[in-house]
């Protein structure tokens, strides 16, 4: 290990960064937001508010739930329990310890509660305080989130997936004509609260309006209006306008002329001006709205209509006799011929009539007259009977039920989002804090529903992202918490009324188990809390950014239709249109787009650049789907000049509804930030995505998540420029916490001296312990390798160590290999892949997989199980890998069947024969009392033991192995402490020397005289402890020395304290499950080399299985002798339409050949001492301006850069903005290659050229998780099914190969009767036949007899269950 004391010069780390030639044309103004902030913000910021002081906590998340549940009072109002504040303890174990010990990473929630007890005067009812007790109460452990946005539950890493659900609010829609045979549209409205009862309002085929509560029996909508306190008159006045008819002597009635109520139609009677008597239009002539407006403009105020025209109109107020005030007809009644004659007899001059015409239908009036309920009371009773059938109704119960349904904040919650949506849809102005329904809401929902029926307005699109919102982790757990606390509230009230309230303390009232069980249940069993996909860093990130429409309160797979699964125009820039699973979950599980974020209301937002008067600014604005509809948004690739002015006469823009229009530059409001914002992280890693068919792009993005981390990683030559971001945000790499200088590096840890802000204070030291060969959730290997050297200066957030599947800080899921597209002897038929032996020989695609095996020694009723080497009837050979305790050594090579941990279990005594008794008496044989229950390596597993962990229960004596492991861990901790102390001391004492030199000593060590000036020679002869003994004349310096000593002592004490705590944790024993005395975990690492049957894929959905490994000498090779690594079938391209892979291959070919060119120039520079300018010129030609920061450095650094580039030139071709065909040709031209990208290939077997030119190039291939080793197995004798007695199937059951129905047909077709009989009987489920055939084989005979198969007996039993007695009569 190297240390900084070896005087190595400090150099910045930045020169390690990889340079890529970028083909992107669009200037990025916004960085990709942190890819896992959706998880962290939701849980830590919004739910727990961990880093916020009590007084500054906002009323959201945990704070809001506790505020809403408390205060809790007892029924008699004597006691009152209030919430004051909450806090969290520091977790007992850190993340790594929790993973190792199979514990949950959580923290104790401590809530401060105040119990007030009141004295109530029985006579006057007045209350006064009797006593107040305040106490901190433990309310259970709450899981904490790790820095990577995951949870550790029982030692496994889990992710809570965000859920897409329908936003609370009101929705209007119709049935699309599906319900009624006439294809008539039946409109309906639905109010969906965040929690509480659903309210539906709907039309039926007869245009009567009904309502339902929670999908129960329907009632008339006017019953609901009456239940909220509206009278018939109020209902009619609210929903209808009225118009006045005045009688005109002997002519008819005069009525106000309203152009707005007129639609184009032919007149049935003359249009007469009532004031002048002029006929404006004759009957039969056509009137239009335009003509009507013209007449109104010319002064037409009233028109004359006949008596007949009033028939069929509805009264807008009660019709009374002018003399007696008697009501002749009620409001809303229809005017009939009889009523009209009464009106003329009584000489009534004025009649007010409802405006009901084609634009305003009579639906509410008709519903009102169908409804039998006349007042509020009868309406409430009606609702009560529907919701509580069979219960006796009284007005109090009915009122209370109706109030609790929609108006009680405890039981009904629209949420702030629901209120905002409701206000905007109904054009109301109710406060956001009102999260229950109001009477205005109900009245206006009905108004909008009727307007829709009258063809005004449009229905809502349920799949619009303005109507779907995301519930993230914080919110999901908040809902669980609320359930737990509501349950707990009931138990608190019970306990308050049960005991003597004066002596009770707050902690006696609270039962935290209720809350804990709810939270625990959510994390371990909820559909949305999932085992993290940890195959590689990309799969982790994608899992955390996933959006699921399934889960509690969501959709179910079977019910989800096509519309929900489909891509919607509002998905643009919010949800990826590409990445979704194939199969039944397609479209229900989505991924967030790269730049998308979730706003405080749960709606997904996408970023846009603001455009002012045709000038594109750098201001980035995030818009939700609702806001976006108001603007015209241009595409990211719209032409812009160097001043940011949009070019061209018209710009193609998106407007509401996903339509595209051409608008002038000054009308554009925003443009996209980058074309990449449309797709998800996985899709943005596919170069030339724009050249692939969408179905294949979907497979490509899904298969990248299945790539296994390889031993040797290799970033893609042809990338997209996003690789670095993914590696950084995934948490696989190690990032520097502070600026600093690397002090020490080895493969296990990196020590960095953080550069302090203030020079006087002692520096802090960051020690990064790297993960070595740890097992991931999917048994892949997590291993971190340092990237820094001693002396490197690192900045905060620099990548200092690579993790699995990362290379130099970029994600590297596969390897760059030389590929040729050509058919080769049929070995690449049907997408098979042919590989060269070099790939196996040089471990190009070799991966390490780690399996964990666990054995538990329990306390049984016959005595404790014991982990030991002393196992009955086991040979010494079988125990060769075990130590004296009975646990395998680290480094042992094991195969299936080997013993990993020796364990014996006591067995019950069986009666002993006299002979055995005698033997025991002679030999003292005790081994009969125990049976062997050792842990063996299961079938199909072999490899090397890489780690052993031993956990002992507290109070159980540790064995030697456990003590040895513990000692090793303590030594590691001590080394960390000593190194940290050494760095601090080095700094402190060199600073102290600086302060002392040149000062006059007043007091000090014996060797220094008083008044002597201190020199560095004097100090060299003193020990470190003696340096602190000086007192100097200068008071300021003395002050500084004291401060420095304070810092030093504080740091030293903190270090020792931390060390002691960790050691104590190690030595104290472990919390093991019930009954377990000792747990041993053994980890076996297996190397998987590439072999036939393994699945491989490119990034373009081009997948295949390896068919054959061909010796290098037989593979096709290039003219310079380079052997091709992989041969793919060219026929896999045309029908699949993923042309991106061809462009990738061509650009990869350019990359290799440019690298050769650079290597040639460097060689020329070394041997012929050619000028470095030639190299610089070539680099500028290749990289453009990207390379300026390299060219400014020294010649040595330029040459070192070229040496890296000589391994392969790296390109970045961002999606939808990458290299075009011309760019690829330019690169091939620069590399001196044929522009077709094809070369002459020579057949390795014959040495002859192939007939045609072949496409060859470097391509990025991945090895997928579907390894043949984990799939293939063979069975000799194994388990049988209990009922049918047929062998089981599948690898996990050690099953056989099923000879199925179709296979039987094949034998029947060949007439192979005996073979068929053998298959159906002795080789399957003829039990007696099986035993006999086994006997005959043992005897060396070859004859057998078929009996009756068990399945025949099963069939007879099934007949009997149908009461058919079938007997089998055997005739001799």
Swiss-Prot record:
The keyword Cell division does not apply. One of its GO terms (cellular component) is DNA-directed RNA polymerase complex. Its EC number is 2.7.7.6. It catalyses: RNA(n) + a ribonucleoside 5'-triphosphate = RNA(n+1) + diphosphate. The keyword Transferase applies. PROSITE patterns: RNA_POL_BETA. Keywords: DNA-directed RNA polymerase, Nucleotidyltransferase, Transcription, Transferase. It is an enzyme of class 2 (transferase). One of its GO terms (biological process) is DNA-templated transcription. GO terms for molecular function: DNA binding; DNA-directed RNA polymerase activity; ribonucleoside binding. PANTHER family: DNA-DIRECTED RNA POLYMERASE I SUBUNIT 2 (PTHR20856). DNA-dependent RNA polymerase catalyzes the transcription of DNA into RNA using the four ribonucleoside triphosphates as substrates. HAMAP family: RNApol_bact_RpoB (MF_01321). The RNAP catalytic core consists of 2 alpha, 1 beta, 1 beta' and 1 omega subunit. When a sigma factor is associated with the core the holoenzyme is formed, which can initiate transcription. Belongs to the RNA polymerase beta chain family. This is DNA-directed RNA polymerase subunit beta. The lineage of its organism: Bacteria, Pseudomonadati, Pseudomonadota, Alphaproteobacteria, Rickettsiales. The gene is rpoB.
């Amino acid at each position: 290990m190297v240390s900084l004391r070896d005087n190595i010069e400090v150099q910045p780390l930045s020169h390690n960064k990889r340079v890529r030639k970028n083909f992107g044309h669009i200037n990025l103004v916004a960085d990709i937001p942190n890819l896992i902030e959706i998880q962290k913000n939701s849980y830590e910021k919004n739910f727990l508010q961990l880093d916020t002081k009590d007084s500054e906590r906002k009323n959201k998340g945990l704070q809001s739930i506790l505020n809403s549940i408390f205060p809790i009072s007892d029924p008699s109002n004597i006691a009152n329990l209030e919430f004051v504040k909450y806090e969290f303890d520091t977790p007992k174990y850190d993340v790594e310890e929790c993973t190792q010990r199979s514990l949950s990473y959580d923290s104790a929630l401590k809530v401060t509660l105040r119990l007030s007890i009141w004295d109530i005067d029985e006579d006057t009812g007045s209350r006064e305080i009797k006593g107040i007790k305040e106490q901190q109460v433990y309310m259970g452990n709450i899981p904490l989130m790790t820095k990577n946005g995951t949870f550790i539950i029982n030692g496994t890493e889990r992710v809570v997936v965000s859920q897409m659900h329908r936003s609370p609010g009101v929705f209007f829609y119709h049935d699309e004509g599906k319900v009624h045979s006439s294809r008539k549209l039946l409109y309906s409205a639905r109010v969906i609260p965040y929690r509480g009862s659903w309210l539906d309002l709907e039309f039926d085929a007869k245009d009567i309006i009904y309502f339902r509560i929670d999908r129960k029996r329907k009632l008339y909508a006017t019953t609901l209006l009456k239940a909220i306190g509206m009278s018939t008159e109020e209902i009619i006045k609210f929903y209808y306008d009225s118009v006045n008819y005045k009688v005109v002597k002997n002519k008819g009635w005069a009525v106000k002329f309203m152009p707005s109520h007129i639609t184009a139609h032919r007149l049935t009677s003359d249009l007469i001006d009532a004031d002048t008597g002029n006929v404006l239009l004759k009957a039969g002539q056509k009137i239009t709205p335009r003509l009507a407006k013209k007449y109104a403009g010319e002064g037409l105020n009233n028109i004359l209509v006949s008596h007949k025209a009033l028939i069929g109109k509805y009264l807008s107020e009660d019709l009374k006799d002018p003399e007696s005030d008697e009501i002749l007809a009620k409001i809303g009644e229809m005017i009939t011929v009889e009523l009209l004659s009464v009106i003329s007899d009584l000489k009534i001059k004025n009649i007010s009539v409802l405006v009901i015409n084609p634009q305003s239908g009579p639906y509410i009036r008709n519903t009102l007259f169908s409804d039998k309920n006349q007042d509020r009371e009868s309406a409430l009773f009606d609702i009560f009977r529907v919701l509580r059938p069979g219960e006796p109704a009284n007005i109090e119960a009915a009122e209370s039920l109706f109030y609790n349904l929609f108006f009680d904040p405890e039981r009904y919650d629209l949420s702030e989002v629901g209120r905002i949506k409701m206000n905007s849809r109904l054009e109301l102005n109710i406060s956001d804090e009102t999260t229950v329904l109001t009477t205005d809401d109900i009245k206006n929902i009905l108004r909008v529903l009727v307007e829709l029926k009258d063809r005004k307005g449009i229905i809502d699109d349920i799949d619009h992202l303005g109507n779907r919102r995301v519930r993230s982790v914080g919110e999901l757990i908040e809902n669980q918490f609320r359930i737990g606390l509501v349950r707990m509230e009931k138990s608190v009230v019970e306990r308050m009324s049960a005991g003597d309230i004066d002596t009770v303390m707050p902690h006696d009232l609270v039962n935290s188990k209720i809350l804990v069980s709810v939270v625990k249940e959510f994390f371990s069993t909820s559909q949305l809390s999932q085992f993290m996909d940890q195959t590689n860093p990309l799969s982790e990130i994608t899992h955390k950014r996933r959006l699921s429409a399934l889960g509690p309160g969501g959709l179910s797979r079977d019910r989800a239709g096509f519309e929900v699964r489909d891509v919607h125009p509002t998905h643009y820039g919010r949800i990826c249109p590409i990445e979704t699973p194939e199969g039944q979950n397609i479209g229900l599980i989505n991924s967030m787009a790269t730049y998308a974020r979730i706003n405080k209301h749960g709606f997904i937002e996408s970023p846009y650049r603001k455009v002012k008067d045709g000038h594109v600014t750098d201001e980035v604005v995030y818009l939700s789907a609702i806001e976006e509809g108001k603007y015209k948004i241009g595409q990211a690739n719209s032409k812009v000049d160097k001043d940011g002015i949009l070019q061209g006469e018209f710009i193609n823009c998106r407007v509401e509804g996903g339509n595209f229009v051409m608008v002038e530059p000054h009308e554009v409001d925003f443009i996209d930030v980058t074309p990449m914002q449309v797709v998800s992280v996985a899709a943005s890693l596919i170069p030339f995505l724009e050249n692939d068919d969408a179905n294949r792009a979907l497979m490509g993005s899904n298969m990248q998540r299945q790539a296994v981390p390889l031993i040797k990683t290799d970033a893609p030559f042809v990338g997209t420029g996003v690789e670095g971001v993914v590696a950084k945000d995934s948490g696989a790499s190690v990032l520097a916490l502070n600026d600093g200088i690397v002090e020490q590096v080895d493969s296990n840890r990196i020590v960095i001296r953080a550069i302090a802000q203030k020079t006087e204070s002692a520096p802090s030291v960051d020690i990064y312990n790297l993960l070595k060969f740890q097992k991931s959730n999917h048994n892949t290997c997590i291993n971190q390798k340092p990237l820094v050297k001693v002396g490197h200066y690192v900045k905060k957030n620099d990548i200092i160590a690579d993790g699995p599947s990362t290379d130099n800080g970029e994600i590297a899921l596969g390897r760059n290999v030389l590929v040729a597209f050509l058919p080769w002897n049929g070995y690449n038929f049907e997408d098979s892949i042919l590989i060269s032996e070099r790939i196996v020989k040089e471990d190009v695609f070799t991966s390490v997989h780690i399996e964990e095996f666990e054995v538990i020694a329990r306390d049984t009723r016959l005595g404790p199980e014991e982990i030991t080497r002393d196992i009955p009837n086991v040979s010494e050979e079988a125990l060769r890998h075990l130590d004296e305790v009975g646990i395998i050594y680290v480094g042992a090579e094991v195969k299936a069947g080997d013993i990993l941990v020796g364990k014996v279990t006591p067995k019950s005594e069986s009666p002993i024969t006299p002979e055995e008794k005698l033997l025991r008496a002679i030999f003292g044989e005790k081994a009969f009392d125990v049976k062997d229950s050792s842990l063996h390596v299961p079938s199909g597993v072999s490899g090397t033991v890489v780690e052993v962990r031993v956990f002992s229960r507290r109070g159980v004596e540790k064995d030697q192995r456990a003590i040895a492991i513990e000692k090793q861990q303590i030594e590691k901790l001590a080394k960390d402490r000593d190194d940290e102390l050494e760095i601090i001391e080095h700094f402190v004492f060199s600073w102290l020397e600086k302060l002392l030199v040149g000062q006059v000593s007043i007091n000090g060590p014996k060797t220094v005289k008083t008044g002597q000036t201190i020199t560095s020679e004097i100090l060299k002869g003193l020990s470190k402890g003696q340096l602190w003994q000086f007192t100097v004349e200068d008071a300021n310096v003395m002050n500084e020395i004291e401060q420095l000593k304070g810092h030093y002592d504080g740091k030293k004490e903190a270090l020792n304290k931390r060390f002691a705590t960790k050691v104590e944790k190690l030595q104290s024993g472990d919390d093991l499950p019930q009954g377990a005395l000792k747990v041993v975990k053994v980890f076996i690492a297996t190397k998987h080399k590439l072999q036939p049957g393994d699945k491989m894929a490119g990034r373009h959905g081009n997948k295949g299985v390896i068919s054959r490994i061909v010796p290098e000498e037989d593979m096709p090779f290039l003219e310079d002798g380079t052997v091709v690594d992989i041969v793919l079938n060219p026929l896999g391209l045309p029908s699949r339409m993923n042309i991106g892979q061809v462009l990738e291959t061509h650009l990869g070919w350019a990359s290799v050949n440019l690298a050769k060119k650079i290597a040639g120039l460097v060689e020329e520079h070394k041997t012929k001492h050619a000028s470095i300018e030639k190299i610089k010129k070539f680099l500028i030609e290749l990289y453009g301006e990207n390379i300026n920061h390299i060219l400014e450095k020294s010649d040595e650094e330029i040459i070192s850069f070229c040496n890296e580039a000589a391994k392969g030139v790296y390109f970045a071709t961002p999606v939808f903005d990458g290299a075009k065909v011309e760019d690829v040709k330019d690169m091939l031209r620069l590399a001196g290659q044929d522009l077709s990208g094809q070369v002459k290939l020579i057949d390795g077997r014959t040495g002859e050229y192939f007939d045609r030119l072949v496409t060859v190039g470097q391509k990025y291939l991945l090895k997928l998780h579907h390894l043949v080793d984990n799939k293939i197995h063979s069975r000799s004798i194994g388990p049988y099914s209990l009922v049918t007695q047929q062998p089981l199937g599948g690898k996990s059951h050690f099953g056989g190969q099923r000879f199925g129905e179709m296979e039987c047909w094949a034998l029947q077709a060949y007439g192979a009767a005996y073979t068929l009989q053998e298959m159906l009987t002795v080789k399957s489920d003829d039990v007696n036949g099986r035993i006999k055939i086994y006997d005959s084989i043992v005897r060396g005979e070859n004859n057998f007899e078929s009996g009756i198969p068990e399945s025949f007996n099963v069939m007879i039993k099934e007949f009997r269950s149908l009461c058919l007695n079938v007997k089998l009569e055997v005739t001799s």
